[in-house]
Swiss-Prot record:
UniProt-listed PANTHER family: TUBEROINFUNDIBULAR PEPTIDE OF 39 RESIDUES
Localization, UniProt: Secreted
Biological process according to GO: neuropeptide signaling pathway
Name this protein carries in UniProt: Tuberoinfundibular peptide of 39 residues
Record-annotated disulphide pairs: none
Entries under Pfam families matching the protein: TIP39
Family: Belongs to the parathyroid hormone family.
GO CC list: extracellular region
Organism: Homo sapiens (Human)
Signal peptide: 1-30
Entry keyword set: Cleavage on pair of basic residues, Neuropeptide, Secreted, Signal
Length: 100
């Protein structure tokens, strides 16, 4: 059986690539630009403290660390929204230009 390659215009290829980038979850990006898996996927720590002694005091996170984490999470969310807005406007522009 012979398979046939479907030829696509460069615009259609670009549109498909942009859709793929929008749909696939890429995880967290580091400063180097390398995407890491979401937190906890490759964790070396045990998933729970079921076998830990309940009398053992757990260290509390400082308020500054929690505030810093919330700030980073908000910055990531805003960056993702900005990327999505740019991608939607770019795809709309491509669709308008391709319209007959």
């Amino acid at each position: 059986m012979e398979t046939r390659q479907v030829s696509r215009s460069p615009r259609v290829r670009l549109l498909l690539l942009l859709l793929l980038l929008l749909v696939v979850p890429w995880g967290v990006r580091t400063a180097s630009g390398v995407a890491l898996p979401p937190v906890g996927v490759l964790s070396l720590r045990p998933p729970g403290r079921a076998w830990a002694d309940p009398a053992t005091p757990r260290p509390r996170r400082s308020l500054a660390l929690a505030d810093d984490a919330a700030f980073r999470e908000r910055a990531r969310l805003l960056a993702a929204l900005e990327r999505r807005h740019w991608l939607n406007s770019y795809m709309h522009k491509l669709l308008v230009l391709d319209a007959p």
